[in-house]
C-alpha cells in the first residue's frame, strides 16, 4: 500500500483522460463544502451541516486534456483529527481553505493545516483558497467583526500566507455567487498535472541512471 501523500500515478480512465485526487481541508464552517457543492452540483447549501467525509466528482478541460477530478471533502473539527489523514492517501493536490471573514480560520492555515498537510502529504502541491469573499461587503458581518476589534482578511494577507506555506497559488472565491469557483478547480488541476509530469520525469531519470 502506498504511503499517504505519495504522488499517485493514476491510470487514465479513458483515452486522453486523466484522473486526479484533490483533498480539501480547512476549519469547520470555512466554506469547503459549499465550494465543492457549487462546483460539482451547481447548488449552494443554504444551511450549514458539518461534513465528515464526502466525495464529489467533476470534469474539467485543461488545454486539450479532459480531466476527472475526484474531490474529497474533510471534517475540520478536532474530533476528526485522527480520521482525516486517511483521506490523504494517493492525493495529487491539497486545497487549504479559510474564511476571509474569520481571522481564526486564517491563523489556523499556518498553525494547524500547513503542518498537518506537510506531515501526511510530503512533496504534494498545495493551493491556498480564501472563501466567502462576498461577505467582505456584508454590513452585518463587518459590524460583528469590528465589535470584536477584528477586520476581514485582505487579499495581500492571503498572498502572504501563500508564500509562508510555499503553496503553488493563492486564489479567492465566493461559492454563493459562483465567483472564481471554476477557476479554483481549473488552476488546481493545472498545478496537479504539472507536479505529476515532473514526478514522472524524475522517475524516468532514475530508471535511466539505474540502467
UniProtKB/Swiss-Prot annotation:
Summarize where GTP binds, as residue positions. 26-33, 73-77, 131-134
Q: Which terms in the GO cellular component ontology are assigned?
A: cytoskeleton; cytosol; extracellular exosome; plasma membrane; secretory granule membrane
Compartments reported by the entry? Cell membrane; Cytoplasm, Cytoskeleton
Main localization of the protein described in the UniProt heading: membrane
**N-acetylmethionine is carried by which residues?**
1
Indicate which residues form the motif Effector region.
Answer: 48-56
State the family named in the UniProt similarity comment for this chain: Belongs to the small GTPase superfamily. Rho family.
> Cross-referenced PANTHER family, in alphabetical order?
RHO FAMILY GTPASE
Instruction: Name the source organism.
Output: Homo sapiens
Specify the protein's topology with respect to the membrane: Lipid-anchor
PROSITE patterns to which the protein is assigned, alphabetical: RHO (PS51420)
Q: What is this protein called?
A: Rho-related GTP-binding protein RhoF
Entry function: Plasma membrane-associated small GTPase which cycles between an active GTP-bound and an inactive GDP-bound state. Causes the formation of thin, actin-rich surface projections called filopodia. Functions cooperatively with CDC42 and Rac to generate additional structures, increasing the diversity of actin-based morphology.
Q: Keywords of this protein's UniProt record, alphabetized? A: Acetylation, Cell membrane, Cytoplasm, Cytoskeleton, GTP-binding, Lipoprotein, Membrane, Methylation, Nucleotide-binding, Prenylation
Pfam families noted in UniProt? Ras
Q: Which residues are assigned to the propeptide feature?
A: 209-211
Q: Which residues carry this modification: Cysteine methyl ester?
A: 208
Amino acid at each position: 500500500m502506498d504511503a499517504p501523500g505519495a504522488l499517485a500515478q493514476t491510470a487514465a480512465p479513458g483515452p486522453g483522460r486523466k484522473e486526479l485526487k484533490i483533498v480539501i481541508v480547512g476549519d469547520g464552517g470555512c466554506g469547503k463544502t459549499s465550494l465543492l457543492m457549487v462546483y460539482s452540483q451547481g447548488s449552494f447549501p443554504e444551511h450549514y451541516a458539518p461534513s465528515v467525509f464526502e466525495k464529489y466528482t467533476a470534469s474539467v478541460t485543461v488545454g486539450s486534456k479532459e480531466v476527472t477530478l475526484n474531490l474529497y471533502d474533510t471534517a475540520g473539527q478536532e474530533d476528526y483529527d485522527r480520521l482525516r489523514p486517511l483521506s490523504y492517501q494517493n492525493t495529487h493536490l491539497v486545497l487549504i481553505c479559510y474564511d476571509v471573514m474569520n481571522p481564526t480560520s486564517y491563523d489556523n492555515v499556518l498553525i494547524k493545516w500547513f503542518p498537518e498537510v506537510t506531515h501526511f502529504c510530503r512533496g504534494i502541491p498545495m493551493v491556498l483558497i480564501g472563501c466567502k469573499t462576498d461577505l467582505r461587503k456584508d454590513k452585518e458581518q463587518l459590524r460583528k467583526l469590528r465589535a470584536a476589534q477584528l477586520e476581514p482578511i485582505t487579499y495581500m494577507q492571503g498572498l502572504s500566507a501563500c508564500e509562508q506555506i510555499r503553496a503553488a497559488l493563492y486564489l479567492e472565491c465566493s461559492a454563493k455567487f459562483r465567483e472564481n469557483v471554476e477557476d479554483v478547480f481549473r488552476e488546481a488541476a493545472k498545478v496537479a498535472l504539472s507536479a505529476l509530469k515532473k514526478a514522472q520525469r524524475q522517475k524516468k531519470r532514475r530508471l535511466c541512471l539505474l540502467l
